[in-house]
UniProtKB/Swiss-Prot annotation:
A Pfam family matched in the record: GDPD_2
Database matches in InterPro entries: PLC-like_Pdiesterase_TIM-brl (IPR017946)
Source species taxonomy: Eukaryota, Metazoa, Ecdysozoa, Arthropoda, Chelicerata
Cofactor(s), by name: Mg(2+)
Catalysed reactions, semicolon-separated: an N-(acyl)-sphingosylphosphocholine = an N-(acyl)-sphingosyl-1,3-cyclic phosphate + choline; an N-(acyl)-sphingosylphosphoethanolamine = an N-(acyl)-sphingosyl-1,3-cyclic phosphate + ethanolamine; a 1-acyl-sn-glycero-3-phosphocholine = a 1-acyl-sn-glycero-2,3-cyclic phosphate + choline; a 1-acyl-sn-glycero-3-phosphoethanolamine = a 1-acyl-sn-glycero-2,3-cyclic phosphate + ethanolamine
Tissues of expression: Expressed by the venom gland.
Top EC group: lyase
Protein name in the entry: Dermonecrotic toxin LgSicTox-alphaIA1
Length: 280
């Protein structure tokens, strides 16, 4: 059992502080949080809005910085709200409201907020790994803005905790080109998926997994969204994904406990580096 693939069970659309405990207690070791921006490219709310997955309340939200503080409590050892299992947070950056030329600025403002309210200015802040998930390949300058700001503020080492994802279901080769432009190698998750009310095949997941497992691929980890059924969970695990985003973490947990899957997979812990490609 020593060489089982670590799996990140990603609680989907966790936008209110109270939902952090709710999803982790159901088995999530990772959460996905939506971030909306104001007209000046400041991250404003953790908010998804309508439409969203069927069966979910689309309108729960917090002020962004309040959410970061709540998340920090949940991921700081010794805090009364600490959840040891929560090790990865995917921020789904809703940059569609921004002009392309605001992307770099959005990255800078993002980094400032995260540094202050989540990382506590580098002084015993939250420990979770962070994925910046960007829906538009043209918004790759956000990554540089983010990195530049952390460096300027004296904490370039925090980039060790940061990974990347382009979530627009673009052609894998186009995603690779965007990372080249952004100067990013490594720490790359690749998402693929669709809202839970629509079916989607696994052909692009298979392409992402093939890239991840090839000698010259750029992808480190692959996740699939939004998976709410046992059958789809099994299909995704069979395809070799590293993460499954879900509205029902307990469903994914149940499948991982089935005999056939228990042998090959386990729930990732803090000791599993989410930027390292798993070797079968």
């Amino acid at each position: 059992a020593g060489n089982r693939r670590p799996i990140w069970i990603m609680g989907h659309m966790v936008n209110a502080i109270g939902q952090i405990d709710e999803f982790v207690n159901l088995g999530a070791n990772s959460i996905e949080t939506d971030v909306s921006f104001d007209d000046n490219a400041n991250p404003e709310y953790t908010y998804h809005g309508i439409p969203c997955d069927s069966g979910r309340n689309c309108k729960k939200y917090e002020n962004f910085n309040d959410f970061l503080k709540g998340l920090r409590s949940a991921t700081t050892p010794g805090n009364s709200k600490y959840q040891e299992k929560l090790v990865l947070v995917v921020f789904d950056l809703k940059t569609g409201s921004l002009y392309d030329n605001q992307a770099n600025d959005a990255g800078k403002k993002w980094a400032k907020n995260l540094l202050q309210h989540y990382w506590n200015n580098g002084n015993n802040g939250g420990r979770a790994y962070i994925v910046l998930s960007i829906p538009d390949l043209n918004h790759y300058p956000l990554i540089k803005g983010f990195k530049d700001q952390l460096t300027k503020d004296g904490h370039p080492e925090l980039m060790d905790k940061v990974g990347h994802d382009f979530s627009g279901n673009d052609d894998i080769s186009d995603v690779g080109k965007a990372y080249k432009k952004a100067g990013i190698t490594g720490h790359i998750w690749q998402s693929d998926g669709i809202t839970n009310s629509l079916p989607r095949g696994l052909s692009r997941v298979n392409a992402a997994v093939a890239n991840r497992d090839s000698a010259n691929g750029f992808i480190n980890k692959v996740y699939y969204w939004t998976v709410d059924k046992r059958s789809t969970t099994r299909d995704a695990l069979d395809a070799g994904v590293d993460g499954i985003m879900t509205n029902y973490p307990d469903v994914i947990t149940d499948v991982l406990n089935e005999a056939a899957y228990k042998k090959k997979f386990r729930v990732a812990t803090y000791d599993d580096n989410p930027w390292v490609t798993f070797n079968k």
